[in-house]
Amino acid sequence: MNKSVGFILLLLMFTNTMNAELANGKIEEFFIKNGIEERKIRIYYPNNNSVDDDTTFIIMNDGEELFLERDSWRGRTWRIDKSFDGLAKINKDPNVIIIAVQSAKKYKGKFFDNTRRYLELFPKEVIEFLPEGNKKKIYGSLADTDYPKFLVESVVPFVEGKFEINLDKNNLGIIGSSMGGLSALNTIIEYPDEFGFAGCLSTHWIGIKPWEYLLLPIRQRISGDQ
């Protein structure tokens, strides 16, 4: 059997098994070239939704943390399929499609390296403002990937081609947590015409002292907060 055909069959079997374990909806898996690597992308259809002109697409960072617990290094995930299942039980059916992008920490799907994830999601524009020293040199030498650019130039065109649609700020958003939340904010700042909203949960605010986290809830809100 041709190796490519065998791989595709194996991927289909795995995806079917995964879908059987979801509380709601279905998933399709794809791999997109990212430099010398391939990045796993999962397209999640809540309630098996079809796509139309009113569908909102949401890119979610750290795709391995969104569904089944076995995909996560810590054995706990968001289980967004259960959240959508809860909405379905109260007759709520959001017209959305989730684009789950696997993080760089799951290197080649074999082991976890959180340093790679941190460096990829770290806003590269900040490096030039760091004080001169070892930290600036290390970040400058290792932070060689541009995650927002990868999303806009690789992931978004792939999704547009698959669904034969145009994505922009009117139908595309991005969500992440911790460093993924910081990256989501950075992405919408860099590409305001591409993304219409960003969800930043438990954001990892780099550059502040640990005790300053305690003051964040009572500080002045960012313009636009409700």
For each predicted feature, which ranges?
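Sec-dependent N-terminal signal peptides
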Residues: 4-14
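Accessory, usually C-terminal, subdomains that scaffold auxiliary metal cofactors
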Residues: 14-15, 226
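Sec/Tat signal peptide C-region and signal peptidase I cleavage site
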Residues: 16-20
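Non-catalytic cap/lid and distal C-terminal segments of serine-dependent acyl enzymes
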Residues: 21-226
